[in-house]
Amino acid sequence: MAAHIALIAHDNKKDALVNFVQQHKSLFSRYDLIATGQTGELVRNKTGLAVDTVFSGPLGGDTQIATQIIDGTIAAVIFLIDPLYAQPHEPDIRTLLRLCEVYNVPLAINLATAKAVIKLLGKTKTGHLIFNPVAGQGNVERELDLIKEHLQSEINLKITFTSAEVNVTDQAKEIVKRIKQANEQSDGEGDSFIIASGGDGTVSGVAAALVNTGIPLGIIPRGTANAFSVALGIPTQIPGACQTINRGITKVVDTALCNDIPMLLLAGVGFEAEMVEKADRELKNNLGVMAYIFAGIQQAREQELFEAHIEIDSETTTMEASAITIANAAPPTSVFAQGAGQVSFTDGLLDITVASSQTALQGLQVVTNLFTSALSKNPSDNENVLHLYGESIKVTTSPPQKIVVDGEIIGTTPVEVKCLPKSLNIFAPVENS
């Protein structure tokens, strides 16, 4: 639904409107507020809420609000009228009344009807969309319009854009803070949640702020690989992803910490980290998901064995490896995580796959075998593949190896990963709930 509440009041009713907004501040904070000149200033000064002001009533502010009703951006109008002592210069309600009737917008004209309107709005869920405008290769404006088209009829949608200057996790944490404050002051009927729209980096960054909060995460994938969405069975097309959110069915899944960095998918040591580094932004923009295949072929020619000390739940093993993958969740295309044939994201355990191919030919055989395991959902039977489980794992290597976590290079070994069971609430398709 539309995200704005319009506030108008005759002179003798301005104080009553300001006090009403103050009394229901937690609900009004979930919406964008727009008000005629002096009314908006009074509400802003008394409540501390952000209010966009249009012209005053005598200068046509009510007409500006009427235009927004026609545009479909107004969720409700609260216009406290003075039926006995209205002044000639004050706004006339008749135009707004006609438009609200035509466009089916709730209109309150006194405190009693205002209470009824906010009770209705209080039952509407608010989705805070964190939208990455540089993700993927599609038409960004069209994608955003498509999201609005599928979500705004069901929820109050508030949009935040990511930027290179601000950490996406910090953006999400600020929204989490506002949601918690609003929930503490409300009856909880209109719960809020956060939606991440972008690639795996955006999704991981937003999810990091939601771990162990209970606030649901919706995902609208628009990246190159969209690995987390694929792993959880979330549709990778915008209409399907929005439908999953609108259905409101949630699932609690595991997450992990990798060197104290939140992790949704997996940590790769050796081959996978080098491959991801080679598949840079320019290559992904040009080739899409094929960038990873191209980079993988290139890395297969260069990858060398390294010595690895692997400690799983306090038990240590030393071996030679070319790739070590520690997975919380992984799609079939993350072949180096497929030692068991599939990765569970609800069992409270990490899946560890170690590959130890010594030649490019052996490496190709390992990749083929692991991909077959993923398709058949059966464990690998290749002699150069070892699969293990554990709640926590620590890896040290000689020489040090690069580490990739959820598609981002974070440094070099040693690396320590701990599973956080049932720590993230996500909107999931019916079959995965």
Swiss-Prot record:
Residues 127-262 form the DAGKc domain. It holds the Pfam family DAGK_cat. Residues 1-145 form the MGS-like domain. One of its GO terms (biological process) is methylglyoxal biosynthetic process. GO terms for molecular function: ATP binding; kinase activity; methylglyoxal synthase activity. One of its GO terms (cellular component) is cytosol. The active site is at 62. Residues 1-126 are annotated as: Methylglyoxal synthase. In the N-terminal section; belongs to the methylglyoxal synthase family. PANTHER family: METHYLGLYOXAL SYNTHASE. This is Uncharacterized protein sll0036.
